[in-house]
A protein has these predicted regions:
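Conserved glycine-rich cofactor-binding loop
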Residues: 13-14, 37
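Conserved glycine-rich Rossmann-like NAD(P)H-binding loop of the short-chain dehydrogenase/reductase
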Residues: 29-43
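Catalytic loop of short-chain dehydrogenase/reductase
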Residues: 91-92, 105, 111, 139-163, ...
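Substrate-binding pocket helix/loop in short-chain dehydrogenase/reductase
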Residues: 96-100, 104-109, 217
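Short C-terminal tail/terminal secondary-structure segment
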Residues: 97, 225, 237, 248-261
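Alpha-helical segment proximal to the catalytic Tyr-Lys
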Residues: 128, 172-173, 245
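Short, small/polar-rich loop/turn modules that mediate ligand/substrate recognition or access, typified
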Residues: 175, 180, 247-249
Length: 261
């Protein structure tokens, strides 16, 4: 589905980014993997190459405009174009779980500023290259916090809602140039270390164990289970392919029914 497509993945060393990278590679994409720290990204790239795929690793801070721009230009120089931009960055989970009325403004603003800046920079700089080719796909990743009222998550909900709004606005501007912009909204996959850290802290603040909290989340889904990284990666492949050519300006609900559209 993605044979010879050139894909840039941000946060490729993390759970979501690495799963999507492997799925893209299986479908024939040429991968340029990035992360703030090179070592975990290099592990993923070597695994893909050893399996017969095409992948290069680079250390890129997705909050640094110059770093992102320089890397994208290097991709253009090597591959001639950028077909897919997939951003799966994460930020450390705040250790303090307090009500919004007690939350420090800097802690509240951190996820909002971080996620919106990264998604804006990576999308804008990729789009500038894609416009020249008249095609491309930009994929964002959010969470159900964008649509639910959830206590003790600080600026997480507003950050996710902002990224989804950015997804729609980018699509409105870029679709006439042949560029699709779509989002993926999982509820949270316990396979990832980031989710374990985030939900684990939330479980502790709620007075339950991590296992009990997972059971609670699963009980709220239609399937009575949480989604997996493989399921999300498969959807990412579809959304990045021409099979999803009719989809743009939308966010795919991967909440297993816990969030009704």
């Amino acid at each position: 589905m993605l044979k010879n497509r050139v894909a840039v993945i941000y946060g490729a060393g993390g759970g979501i980014g690495s799963a999507v990278a492997r799925a893209f590679a299986l479908e024939g994409a040429k991968l340029f993997l990035t992360g703030r720290h090179r070592a975990p990204v290099e592990v993923v790239a070597k695994e893909i190459v050893s399996g017969g795929g095409s992948a290069e690793a680079a250390e890129v801070d997705a909050l640094d405009e110059q770093a992102v721009d320089t890397h994208l230009q290097s991709v253009i120089d090597k591959a001639g174009r950028v077909d897919i931009s997939f951003n799966a960055i994460g930020i450390p989970t705040p250790k303090i779980r307090v009500p919004l009325v007690e939350l420090d403004v800097e802690q509240f603003s951190l996820p909002i500023a971080t996620y919106t800046r990264s998604y804006f920079l990576t999308a804008r700089l990729a789009a500038r290259r894609m416009v020249a080719n008249g095609s491309g796909v930009i994929i964002t990743v959010t969470a159900t916090l964008s649509r639910t009222g959830t206590p003790f998550v600080g600026g997480g909900g507003p950050a996710m809602a902002a990224v989804e709004a950015l997804t729609r606005d980018l699509s409105a501007e870029l679709a006439p140039h042949g560029i699709r912009v779509v989002g993926l909204r999982p509820q949270g996959m316990p396979e990832t270390s980031r989710i374990k850290e985030s939900f684990g802290a939330y479980a502790k603040a709620s007075g339950v164990t991590w296992e009990q909290f997972q059971e609670l989340l699963a009980s709220r889904t239609h399937t009575r289970r949480l989604s997996t990284l493989a399921e999300m990666a498969n959807v990412a492949v579809f959304m990045a392919s021409d099979q999803a050519s009719g989809m743009t300006g939308t966010v795919v609900n991967l909440s297993m029914g816990s969030l009704d559209d």
